[in-house]
Amino acid sequence: NAECVIVADANINQQTLDFIESCRLGEQLNIVEIDPKNEHKTAHLYNSFAELQSFMLQRVMVENQNVWITCDSKSHVQTLQAILNDLDVKNIAIVGNENVKKETAEFLQNPEAESLKYQVVISTSAIASGVSIEHNHFDFVAGFFTGSSVQPTDAYQMLGRVRQCKEFHLFADQN
């Protein structure tokens, strides 16, 4: 019943446009496309989980950098967090319906502020769309993907949570 509907999306696809048209039968859609600007972002691809893990640990342990990690596999999250815990790196892992832990619940209530408390945040698709980390606490984003549990568009969204990061390091399992 709305007189006007405005949709803004950086990666809207034809399926979404078709759905919107089906909701507004007989109406002409006005589509405004804006050419993307070069934000000077770089993506580095790794041949294995171990290779990216080694790179990430070098940057965290030796260079004292902060990293936002995103994974589509709970086992990857557990592996990475176990290593970071063994090395006494202050970290938090946000995985599926596990917000019963106080620090996880607090993080999900205010990820922008809470993320500043950690050298490493390990996230999954459990962090809802619409979450944006706008501060410059994180030096880079690392993505560990199996390719079996999230769609490429979702992986893209997961990687883009930390808006100011220009450096992305990725492993995507080809099996």
Task: Show where each model-derived region lies.
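Conserved RecA-like helicase motor-core motifs
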Residues: E27-I34, L87-E103
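Conserved helicase ATPase motor motifs in RecA-like P-loop NTPase domains
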Residues: N1-I20, G147, Q174
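Conserved helicase motor
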Residues: C71-S75, I92-E106, T124-I127
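Conserved strand-helix element at the start of the C-terminal RecA-like helicase core
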Residues: I12-T16, Q58-L84
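Conserved two-lobed SF2 helicase motor
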Residues: S115-G130
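Long, low-complexity intrinsically disordered regions enriched in Ser/Thr/Pro/Gly
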Residues: E98, Q109-S115, K166, L170-N175
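Conserved SF2 helicase motif VI
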Residues: V141-E167
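Interdomain hinge/linker at the junction between the two RecA-like core domains of SF2 helicases
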Residues: N11-V60
